[in-house]
Amino acid sequence: MSGGTGAGKTTFLNAMSDFIPKEERIITIEDNAELQIQGVENLVRLEAREANLEGEGAVTIRDLIKSALRMRPDRIIVGEVRGEETVDMISSAMLNGHSGSMSTGHANNPKDMLHRIETMMMMGIDLPLQAIQRQVASALDIIIHLGRIRDKTRKVLMIEEILGYEDGKIQTKTLYEFKEVGTENEKVKGSIMK
C-alpha cells in the first residue's frame, strides 16, 4: 500500500488482513505496534527497539525481517518500509516463497512508490539499478494507492498491477482508478473504476 501521511495505509492493511486464510502463519514487523490483525491463530508480532543510552541493544526492522524468515512464516507483514530493510523484504521474503506478504510506504502515486522502493533497496545493497528493478518487478504483484481527497475522506485512489520488467523499466498497468463525478453536501462523489 502506498499513500501520504494520514491516507489510511495502516487501516487498509488491517482490513486487508481479514482476507488472509486464518490457518496461515503470519509474522508482523513494526517500529511501533499499530497493526490490529484479528482472528489469526498463528500470529507472531515483532517490534523494533531503539538502542539504550549506551548505544547498545537496538533491534532494527531489518534484523526482525531476517529473524522472521527463520520462523517459517506463510507471509510477512511489515508495517512500513522506510529504508534499507526493503532489500530483505523484497529479496529475502517476497522472492523466496512468502508471496502475499504486505507492507506500506509513503509515496504520491504507485509509480513514485516503485521509485522509492528502488531507492530504498539501493541504500541496502550494491547492485545495478537494472538488477534491483528486476527483483522489484518479480516480487510485487500490485500497489494499492490511498489518499485523502479534498473533502478530507480517505479513498483507494488507484490499484496498479506490476506486469514485470521489460524495455529497461518496470511495466505496470492501472487496474482501477478513483473517478470523481461531483459533490453532494460538501462530500466528493465518485467511485473506483476500471
What is each stretch, according to the model?
Residues 1:
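Hydrophobic anchor at the beta1->P-loop junction of P-loop NTPases
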Residues 6:
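Walker A (P-loop) phosphate-binding loop of P-loop NTPases
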Residues 9:
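Conserved lysine of the Walker
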Residues 14, 18-66, 113-117:
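P-loop NTPase switch/communication element
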Residues 23, 120-123, 178, 182:
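Hydrophobic alpha-helical segments
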Residues 30, 37-40, 68-167:
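Conserved P-loop NTPase nucleotide-binding/switch module
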Residues 60, 128-129, 193:
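General structural signal for secondary-structure boundaries
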Residues 135, 152-194:
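NTP-binding/hydrolysis catalytic cores, primarily Walker-type P-loop NTPases
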